[in-house]
């Protein structure tokens, strides 16, 4: 399967160097929403190494799975630094500074790839933009589809924040409560479904259904078309996940290595108390909100080490 080939390439080049060595995932805690804490390694060199691997992942972030497989076959991934430079020039918007959303969007995509094994990249902001004026599509920070061995269809709608803790917490709340609705979702999905031909076959099957809804109902208002999309999700039993990444500066958590696990668990309790009563009635279909939280000791060093 192409998925197996893609994940094999990823694991060889990136995954095996990060999983449970530079990045650790804890068990998820589930109440009204699901909360998954992460942390990075304690060694003071960790943020630099993590930033360097994030840079090496840029090509895999900016290109679809099938394109990555083809590039690997042609030997283009032997030097991931060159591949990253190419992707930055050809696929990524020219954004600089701490406000550059690429840092958080790429880290979300990296963690999804690192800790799942059947999620197909449907869109990142990197994939669709107008080269002439460098305008990006407006929508979720990441969009993925997974179809498991039982043919269950899962749609992952991503929002990612990186920066101060207060900013990350408040903006995730604002984005989900303000944007995560079927109208907003339909607008992006219809745009992509009309253009995407590079993702893997199972994801394309669902995309084709979405494109059919768009075409068959093109004379209707966007609100009516969004309702038709909701009906498709119901008919096809599409599971919707709003996956949110909060990656924020929190050096105090890493002060004492032997207390690190407890500090992380206390941190997730605080996040949970903030969000438990939020994100109700986002869409009419059933959905889950997944909150992935990774405190970072030196966020500035991580960004600088990405070199973008």
Where does each model-flagged region fall?
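A structured, charge-rich N-terminal accessory region that forms the first stable segment of a protein
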Residues: 2-85
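Charged, often glycine-rich, active-site loop that binds/positions anionic groups
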Residues: 83-87, 131-144
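A short, highly charged nucleic-acid-interacting micro-segment common to nuclease
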Residues: 85-109, 129-132
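Conserved catalytic cores of phosphodiester-cleaving nucleases, focusing on short active-site segments
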Residues: 112, 142-144, 155-162
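A short acidic/basic microdomain associated with nuclease active sites
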Residues: 115-135
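Short, solvent-exposed loop/turn segments that connect beta-strands within catalytic domains
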Residues: 120, 148-153
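Acidic, metal/cofactor-coordinating or nucleic-acid-engaging core segments within structured domains
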Residues: 170-245, 251-258, 262
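Extended, charged low-complexity segments
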Residues: 255-308
